[in-house]
A protein has these predicted regions:
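Soluble acyl-CoA-dependent acyltransferase catalytic core bearing the H(X)4D motif
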Residues: 1-283, 287-339
């Protein structure tokens, strides 16, 4: 299946896909509720008007809510200068980043794309690594991806000493109460991946530290506002902005938490779910991570002229993950047995 991003981001589309599937192989077929001819005739005519009215009511409600919040907590006004300064600092940090390092991942893009996906890795093992290392699931997976990209470059005889590349990572900004809403509601952060670090343990620690710093910064919210702003500007302005920020990174990386239970489609068991993140801003590589039913899969999409063999990256990811597990979890269990 192929969806346009205007329908929704990864979180929203995951919800849509989930609703199209069943949790049992023999789920009953739900028949659509019939509509009267009157509804059928007036629906398309009234829908734009109703949508406009609902949007106006929501905007008014938001404004009233914000006004009441300031009346209840006037001290929040004192925080506005600090918040503005923090946002400006986050934006200037990205704008002042030097152009991305020249690697085989960057270059002139063509039309043809290549895709690959890894064998699933157990989510429980990812969590075990994180528990021992004091890291999040996302930190563990990103560290394994960094190791895989490092291994790929070494395989192409590219010098990786001291090398770092940046990844643009979408961050879901929906509150839990609106987790099932359609639309795009994400910000962006720029993460530097330490490809020049040979030790997988040190690499994980560095990724963890950098992700924690990004979570404390307003960068994701700042870029959410920028995405909305540039989306309303002329196409030429929007394209220049996208290219500017695209020059600061090598890849788009996203992690979507999928369904935790076994799903079925038309009575057939779904063994795995995978997607490939769309690329923009002249970025030649997209890396997507999807969890489903206790397993995690890595997907890679690349420009065929730059990386014609993305399966080498997915294979390296599997290897790097097992190295992390053996070095961190197995070693920890060995130390416990010895004591």
């Amino acid at each position: 299946m192929r969806f346009h991003h205007c329908i929704g981001d990864g979180t929203a589309m995951n919800t849509v896909m989930h609703r199209l599937m069943d949790t049992t192989p023999d789920a009953p077929i739900e028949r659509p509720t019939p509509h009267s001819n009157h509804d059928h005739t007036l629906g398309p005519l009234l829908e734009p008007l109703v949508s406009t009215i609902e949007g106006t009511i929501k905007l008014a409600d938001d404004l009233v809510h914000e006004g009441m919040e300031f009346l209840r907590h006037p001290e929040h006004l004192l925080n506005l200068p600090a918040q503005a300064a923090s946002g400006a600092l986050a934006l200037s940090r990205v704008l002042l980043l030097p152009p991305e390092a020249k690697t085989p991942f960057k270059g002139q893009l063509g039309v043809q794309k290549c895709v690959a996906w890894s064998a699933p890795v157990p989510l429980d093992q990812v969590k075990q690594i994180g528990k021992v290392a004091g890291a999040k699931v996302n930190d563990v997976l990103l560290a394994a991806v960094a190791g895989a990209l490092r291994a790929y470059l070494i395989g192409r005889d590219f010098k990786v000493d001291g090398l770092e590349i940046r990844a643009v990572i979408p961050v879901d900004l929906r509150p839990p109460s609106r987790a099932h809403d359609l639309g795009n509601e994400f910000g962006l952060v720029f993460l530097s991946l330490p490809l020049g670090t040979p030790s997988p343990v040190v690499r994980l620690a560095e990724v963890k530290q950098r992700m924690e710093a990004l979570k404390r910064s307003p960068e994701a919210h700042v870029f959410y506002g920028l995405l909305n702003f540039f989306g309303r500007t002329p196409a030429q302005v929007e394209e220049q902005a996208v290219n500017l920020f695209g020059s600061k990174a090598t890849a788009v990386m996203t992690n979507v938490r999928g369904p935790t239970e076994q799903l079925y489609l038309a009575g057939n068991r779904i063994r795995n779910i995978m997607f490939w993140v769309p690329q923009s801003g002249r970025l030649g590589m997209g890396i997507s991570i999807m969890s489903y039913c206790g397993q995690v899969t890595l997907g890679v999409i690349t420009d065929a002229g730059l990386v014609p063999d993305p399966q080498k990256i997915t294979t390296a990811f599997e290897r790097e993950f097992h190295v992390l597990y053996d070095v961190i979890v197995a070693k920890e269990h060995g130390n416990e047995s010895a004591s």
